[in-house]
Regions:
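N-terminal secretory signal peptides and thylakoid transit peptides that target proteins
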Residues: 1-18
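N-terminal Rossmann-like dinucleotide-binding module
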Residues: 14-82, 159-162, 254
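Residues forming the Rossmann-fold NAD(P)(H) cofactor-binding site
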Residues: 52, 113, 248
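Conserved SAM-binding strand-loop segment of SAM-dependent methyltransferases
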Residues: 86-90
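N-terminal Rossmann-like NAD(P) cofactor-binding module of classical short-chain dehydrogenase/reductase
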Residues: 103-104
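N-terminal glycine-rich "phosphate-gripper" loop used for MgATP/nucleotide binding
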Residues: 107-110
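Beta-strand-loop-alpha-helix segment that lines the small-molecule cofactor/substrate pocket
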Residues: 113-161, 175, 400
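Contiguous beta-strand/loop segments that form the cofactor/metal-binding neighborhood of enzyme cores
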Residues: 167, 179, 184-188, 193-240, ...
Length: 434
């Protein structure tokens, strides 16, 4: 177990009403300066699907001491691989296991916030899958609590640690394109059940599933196999469709490399919004103010079946084209060589030396930072801001009108109808009282 030391003075003790009206103690954090062979004790929430991949990756260097899943079948499968880990159906009970240093959160988007907040308030380091949350407000809250507790955090956009993405960010930071005029992002993925309707039949809840725990903070609705396992991403309230699923990956390089911050206006197009289900395709257009002034920088996102009419995107497949005064940079998220076009323009230009660190991988960057060795680069401050931008684009699509966006205040002054989507209602007893 990692040696602990009292962290700097934190916010007042948080009360929790979810498990027998217990009160969470003042957090204590893992100490820095650990020996090279000392390992973190890690608890994992959500151990199937993507969660299994994350768990196995962290287990290469650390101890898995606790497993939690609302699906008993998935929990049993994980326990076969990690028989020494204690098993839980309720993450709140898992977090009371005193030897846990860090937590990996792999659950559906709508429970990212409540689990991560509970862990951070106990001083546990957190790795949480992307997008950071299911709403703008939750992503901001997670970033704020991470900053106030001082825990080490990382959002799970794993390609952020790759040499491929970091080289693109370096080129953009160095200004190789000159003044950037536009960013075009494309994702051809279409999620199962997108563009459909909300299920109306009410089959029985499987015996192995704790449906109330699966719902967590969202308003109650009947179980349906379209939601679990795996289909939840396209149903509003649980997930936010294609864009939220892939936006934190594909927009990561230009967001980081161009230091974009918050947009000032967001527009969206696509099929008429369904109040319950995400569409198969959409277009989202952002306008970002520039520090040096002048016309805003435009970032356009296309996903699913929507053809990017009128755009020059040859060579882009699930990636971005950054258009600048000197030419274009083409980056494909899934790999392949980054291109600077036209080739004759850039042939004689000396490209900048690498300036960003190259971690072993995204997980090791986090675990090393938990031990006081280095920092994470997609922490909840960065990952939260990127998630907010993506999720605000989803809001613009759902309300069906442009948003004059105030990112700092998380509101659209011209569209009060957006407020319930920015900060959705939650069932009582799930969010901690801060």
């Amino acid at each position: 177990m990692i040696r602990r030391t009292t962290r700097r003075r934190f916010l007042r003790t948080a009360a929790w009403t979810g498990v027998g009206a217990c009160v969470w103690p003042v957090p204590r954090l893992a100490a820095a300066g650990l020996s090279a062979n000392e390992k973190l004790n890690v608890g994992v929430v959500g151990v199937g699907g993507r969660g299994a991949s994350n768990m196995n990756a962290v287990a290469r260097t650390e101890n898995i001491v606790a497993l939690c899943d609302v699906d008993a079948r998935r929990l049993a499968q994980a326990a076969e691989k990690y028989p020494r880990a204690r098993q839980y159906a309720d993450y709140r009970r898992m977090l009371q296991q005193n030897d846990i240093d860090a937590v990996v959160v792999n659950t559906p988007d709508h429970t990212h916030a409540v689990i991560s907040l509970a862990a951070m308030l106990l001083g546990k380091h957190v790795y949480c899958e992307k997008p950071l949350a299911s709403s703008v407000y939750e992503a901001r809250l997670m970033a704020d609590v991470a900053a106030r507790t001082g825990v080490v955090t990382q959002m799970g956009n794993q390609v952020h640690a790759s040499d491929h993405l970091r080289r693109v960010a370096e080129l953009l930071k160095a200004g190789v394109l000159g003044r950037v005029e536009k960013v075009v992002a494309v994702c051809h993925k279409v999620l199962r059940h997108s563009g459909g309707d909300l299920p109306t039949d009410t089959p029985p809840v499987p015996e192995q599933l704790d449906w109330d725990q699966w719902l967590g903070p969202v308003p109650e609705r009947p179980y349906h196999p379209a939601y679990h396992p795996g289909g939840w991403r396209v149903f509003w309230g649980f997930g936010s469709g294609n864009f939220a699923d892939m936006g934190c990956h594909i927009l990561d390089a230009p967001y980081w490399g161009l230091n974009l911050g918050y947009p000032v206006r967001i527009e969206a197009e696509g099929p008429p919004p369904n109040p319950d289900v995400a569409p198969k395709s959409k277009l989202v257009r952002y306008h970002f103010e520039r520090e040096e002034g002048g016309s805003p920088l435009e970032v356009v996102w296309y996903d699913g079946e929507l053809a990017p009419a009128g755009e020059v995107i040859e060579g882009v497949s699930d990636g971005v084209m950054v258009i600048g005064e000197r030419g274009r940079l083409i980056y494909n998220f899934r790999g392949g060589a980054t291109q600077l076009l036209p080739t004759e323009t850039f042939a004689g230009i000396e490209l900048p030396e690498p300036t960003l660190t190259r971690p072993q991988n995204h997980y090791v960057e986090w675990t090393e930072a938990c031990k006081g060795r280095g920092e994470t680069s997609s922490d909840f401050h960065y990952g939260g801001a990127l998630s907010e931008v993506v999720l605000a684009g989803v809001v613009a699509y759902r309300v069906g009108e442009p948003l004059d966006w105030n990112g700092r205040e998380m509101r659209a002054a011209n569209c009060p109808e957006a407020e319930p989507l920015i900060r959705p209602p939650a069932r009582s007893g799930w969010f901690p009282e801060l």
